[in-house]
Amino acid sequence: MTEDFISSVKRSNEELKERKSNFGFVEYKSKQLTSSSSHNSNSSHHDDDNQHGKRNIFQRCVDSFKSPLDGSFDTSNLKRTLKPRHLIMIAIGGSIGTGLFVGSGKAIAEGGPLGVVIGWAIAGSQIIGTIHGLGEITVRFPVVGAFANYGTRFLDPSISFVVSTIYVLQWFFVLPLEIIAAAMTVQYWNSSIDPVIWVAIFYAVIVSINLFGVRGFGEAEFAFSTIKAITVCGFIILCVVLICGGGPDHEFIGAKYWHDPGCLANGFPGVLSVLVVASYSLGGIEMTCLASGETDPKGLPSAIKQVFWRILFFFLISLTLVGFLVPYTNQNLLGGSSVDNSPFVIAIKLHHIKALPSIVNAVILISVLSVGNSCIFASSRTLCSMAHQGLIPWWFGYIDRAGRPLVGIMANSLFGLLAFLVKSGSMSEVFNWLMAIAGLATCIVWLSINLSHIRFRLAMKAQGKSLDELEFVSAVGIWGSAYSALINCLILIAQFYCSLWPIGGWTSGKERAKIFFQNYLCALIMLFIFIVHKIYYKCQTGKWWGVKALKDIDLETDRKDIDIEIVKQEIAEKKMYLDSRPWYVRQFHFWC
């Protein structure tokens, strides 16, 4: 065993030298863990565990930041400690945040209650196709980074590099914004305390959670999502009571505001504006599959199916009911992104319920912290995936003994320090332009997922593989991904339209140019990154394009090791069972 361990270390050192000699970049090589290497790794960890009794807590903490004992930099060093309950709650409450609680105010003002229903229904329908397509691939290939890895495999390395880079930049810039938003939210109760103090506290909390590893992230998100879900459920019940006249004023509201001032504001342009807001409120939906390298893939299908109910219940129903309680002409819906602009808070205040605004404000604070927590998780895992594909320097993929992608966490944490500009007079303008760099990231990522799933299905067909080989099959299939791709293109066009002809008009040509570039600067940045990476790729490989023919796409590397015959038998048995059940039971299993 000692000789095997020494030879394993030598191989790892040779691999490390090879990486360093290539200017920090590595060629993408999928790594298969052999039984012998797994045995050596397990033996090393066993020896390490035996030493724990001889070390104090401080020593163990310091050692956890060191590189793995076998010297490898493989993504297999990530810990699969996320449990199904974590995934399900991340799926249910993961994207319930400021987009729903605050951003929806602008949507109601510009589109009216009916425009909100139409916009969120369209955006939500494409999410179902996107997440089911991503889930199908992820269960088949449960690797860290999910779509960041699949873009290289099914599309083109340059496309994957652009999409992953923009996605990472988005989370880099969102983190300081969310920390500032959390500090400003506290001002609702006490404005006498310097916001810099709150920035420091929230920054420390978010970074500390992620330093506890994926288990810390999972437990925090489980708690955050549970609170958010309970709050939305309670608010839905409250809305029904108020609409029916059960409030303090005992006034029956019904569809009063749908008639006066009306159900649709600004016509078709208003619906387009709502569509853009809705798409960003649903951002982060892909987080469920992003954690596939750190959880048991068996829990993914159930978590993926929860997305349908989340969109229906937490977004469509809650926003429809808010539209019955708040007229779109309410001035508090416009002119800001603070708690006072939340349609949920406005609805409660309009009907004179005194204690609840503070409760909703507390939930908004939790939502902001949840998004900040997700920022570091998403960016660090994507950077780790990019590093192991050879798209960026290998040291971005460093994973310590505790299974943390440490360099990725540190990189986003450094950007988080920008939150201390909270008292700067030009802070708002600076962050508006920083966010413009990654402004289209959400839709671009979803579009790449749709195209990856379409190429995956076509590759399976070209290579003579059956869908019976898949443990999880998208409920909407390849046509669902095609529909989602079409809707994502429509959202990008809608944002282009709203950038050129914003609702309310503009005062000057300078303002028009500013609005356009803040909305579409991302497209120019992406084009520049794509061209630069294409030149680099050409120099490295001698080819301009890395798109593979369908028959040449690798459908085996990183594939989950399963017995296809057993999978087919399990699917057949489940089908026989469901065929004997009533239609509503079949529908429940289909969507849940």
UniProtKB/Swiss-Prot annotation:
Transcription: present as a keyword of the record? no
Which biological processes are named by the entry's GO terms? amino acid transmembrane transport; aromatic amino acid transport; tryptophan transport
State which ranges are Extracellular (membrane side).
109-113, 182-192, 248-266, 328-358, 426-428, 494-514
| GO terms under cellular component | eisosome; endoplasmic reticulum; membrane; plasma membrane
Q: Which molecular function terms from Gene Ontology are attached?
A: amino acid transmembrane transporter activity; aromatic amino acid transmembrane transporter activity; catalytic activity; high-affinity tryptophan transmembrane transporter activity
Q: Which Gene3D superfamilies match?
A: Amino acid/polyamine transporter I
Organism's domain of life?
A: Eukaryota
User: What is the topology of this protein in the membrane according to its UniProt annotation?
Assistant: Multi-pass membrane protein
Q: Which UniProt keywords apply?
A: Amino-acid transport, Membrane, Transmembrane, Transmembrane helix, Transport
Q: Where is this region: Disordered?
A: 31-53
Segments spanning the bilayer are 88-108, 114-134, 161-181, 193-213, 227-247, 267-287, 307-327, 359-379, 405-425, 429-449, 473-493, 515-535
Locations listed in the record: Membrane
- Which PANTHER family is this protein grouped with? AMINO ACID PERMEASE, TRYPTOPHAN PERMEASE
Similarity-based family = Belongs to the amino acid-polyamine-organocation (APC) superfamily. YAT (TC 2.A.3.10) family.
Comment field (misc):
Present with 752 molecules/cell in log phase SD medium.
Report the protein's function.
Required for high-affinity tryptophan transport. Also transports cysteine, phenyalanine and tyrosine.
Name of the protein: Tryptophan permease
Q: Which organism is it from?
A: Saccharomyces cerevisiae (strain ATCC 204508 / S288c) (Baker's yeast)
